[in-house]
């Protein structure tokens, strides 16, 4: 829309669990903290009748697309999801199931358990760092044609930093603006010398794009 050419360059490869063996008879709601969690669930299970409590709008959109009809979005981060559960569910009455990846930035289950909820967890996918930078991304960085880089998680930021170092391209980032979805994601970029590192005020794509508009 602003004349920029977007390039998608995944830093992580998502691997779904071969089997998802969890019982749902006592579960009142499913908790999703990424679209990958929704996709992983649907890769091994077909149940979409339970309420889906989602960390943000992108995850909620993925749940709706997957066939969930009772979807609530916290519109933010892990703390917002915890607050949403507290507002809509009752400890001791509602048992929850957090469907998550192998690596977590926040212990949502532990936080909800501390508030009196019964919470089960199931690891249903893993995001694995790639072995090298995607060719298009490496080319843009090497030719100093990259203007802005968006980072949607801390693990993606850490993986990018390592891969850039492996490719001996770290000194090519000093003209690039990095935009991170959260401070945690920004913390994964500290080893690189960027033109600037911007952090979204709220953890969503629209705010990240707004930060780009501020600079361009």
Positions of PLM-derived features:
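Signature of uroporphyrinogen-III synthase
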Residues: 1-216
């Amino acid at each position: 829309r602003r004349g920029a050419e977007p390039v998608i360059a995944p830093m992580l490869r998502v691997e779904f669990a071969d089997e998802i063996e969890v019982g749902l008879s006592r579960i009142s709601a499913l908790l999703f903290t990424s679209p990958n969690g929704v996709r992983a669930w649907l890769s091994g299970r077909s149940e979409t009748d339970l309420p889906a409590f989602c960390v943000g709008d992108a995850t909620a959109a993925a749940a709706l697309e997957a066939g969930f009809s009772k979807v609530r979005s916290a519109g933010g981060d892990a703390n917002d999801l915890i607050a949403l559960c507290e507002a809509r569910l009752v400890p001791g009455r509602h048992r929850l199931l957090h469907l998550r990846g192998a690596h977590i930035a926040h212990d949502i289950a532990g936080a909800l358990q501390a508030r009196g909820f019964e919470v089960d967890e199931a690891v249903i996918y893993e995001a694995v760092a790639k072995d090298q930078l995607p060719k298009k991304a490496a080319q843009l960085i090497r030719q100093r044609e990259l203007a802005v880089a968006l980072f949607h998680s801390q693990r993606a930021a850490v993986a990018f930093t390592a891969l850039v170092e492996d490719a001996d391209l770290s000194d090519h980032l000093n003209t690039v603006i990095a935009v991170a979805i959260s401070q945690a994601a920004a913390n994964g970029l500290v080893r690189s010398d960027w033109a600037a590192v911007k952090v979204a005020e709220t953890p969503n794509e629209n705010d990240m794009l707004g930060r780009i508009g501020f600079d361009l």
